[in-house]
């Protein structure tokens, strides 16, 4: 008989595995000193251990509840559970003074690690074949509910096609704008010649009048100068006649 006995080797959970169920592990202290234990698991989200750490007096046996919280759906018949538990025991000769084992576990492990006794406990699922037909029906119903979602998502591509048709609509409005721009220059070209003709017609008489006025001015100047010249000549003749 060993100083500490831990059992069983395997925890078995039966269908339906979608419901909560409880199995037990026992820890027996066959030594003459107090021991402390702690339980660890590879799947803490699916199990709850009570207590997960405690003290076992000499000659005492403690039943540890291992509560399976249940799966979201029933697994397949050939599913193999790989969940495991590790039970570790250490000597605890000191008074814990009301402290929890979890709070002093690191100190006990550092001091009595070489005297530790541990055991691995495996988990097994017993899956009933009667559960699977209902599961298959649920899976088919889920698939049927998923198919309409896929169909609803396909029409979302339609707006993309509509947008592609709307894009070429912009070039169709451009040709009328170009025609209007081409019509404007001929109007300007027609109006420019008329204005130029008016300006040339109005400006042509001005040089003729100026020429006439310029012609009359020299004629008058020449006539006045000739009169003065004649008078001077006559005066010279008269003065010359008197001095003889």
From Swiss-Prot:
Residues 135-219 are annotated as: Disordered. Changing residue 120 to N: Reduces binding to FFAT motif and impairs OPI1 function. Keywords: Acetylation, Endoplasmic reticulum, Membrane, Nucleus, Phosphoprotein, Transmembrane, Transmembrane helix. GO terms for biological process: endoplasmic reticulum inheritance; endoplasmic reticulum membrane organization; endoplasmic reticulum polarization; endoplasmic reticulum-plasma membrane tethering; negative regulation of protein import into nucleus; phospholipid biosynthetic process; regulation of intracellular lipid transport; regulation of phosphatidylinositol dephosphorylation. The modification Phosphoserine is found at residue 106. It comes from the Eukaryota. The MSP domain is required for binding to the FFAT motif of target proteins. Acts as an endoplasmic reticulum (ER) membrane anchor for cytoplasmic proteins via binding to the FFAT motif of targeted proteins. Regulates phospholipid biosynthesis by modulating the subcellular localization of the transcriptional repressor OPI1. Also contributes to the tethering of the ER to the plasma membrane. This is Vesicle-associated membrane protein-associated protein SCS2. It comes from Saccharomyces cerevisiae (strain ATCC 204508 / S288c).
């Amino acid at each position: 008989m060993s100083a500490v006995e831990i059992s069983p080797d395997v925890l078995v959970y039966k269908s339906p595995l979608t419901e909560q169920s409880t199995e037990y592990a026992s820890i027996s202290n066959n030594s003459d000193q107090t021991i402390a234990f702690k339980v660890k698991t590879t799947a803490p989200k699916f199990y709850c251990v009570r207590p997960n750490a405690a003290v076992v007096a000499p000659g005492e046996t403690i039943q540890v509840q291992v509560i399976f919280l249940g799966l979201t759906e029933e697994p397949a018949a050939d599913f193999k559970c790989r969940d495991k538990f590790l039970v570790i025991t250490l000597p605890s000769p000191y008074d814990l003074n009301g402290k929890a084992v979890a709070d002093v576990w690191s100190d006990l492990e550092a001091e009595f690690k070489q005297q530790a006794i541990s055991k691995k406990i495996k988990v097994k699922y017993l899956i009933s074949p009667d559960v699977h037909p209902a599961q298959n029906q649920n899976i088919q119903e889920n698939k049927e509910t998923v198919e309409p979602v896929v169909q609803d998502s396909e029409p979302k591509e339609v707006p993309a096609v509509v947008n592609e048709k709307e894009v070429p609509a912009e070039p169709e409005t451009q040709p009328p704008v170009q025609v209007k721009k081409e019509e404007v220059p001929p109007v300007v070209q027609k109006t420019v010649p008329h204005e130029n003709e008016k300006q040339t017609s109005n400006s042509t008489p001005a040089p003729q009048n100026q020429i006439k006025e310029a012609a009359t001015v020299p004629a008058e100047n020449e006539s006045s100068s000739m009169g003065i010249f004649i008078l001077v000549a006559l005066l010279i003749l008269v003065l010359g006649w008197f001095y003889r």
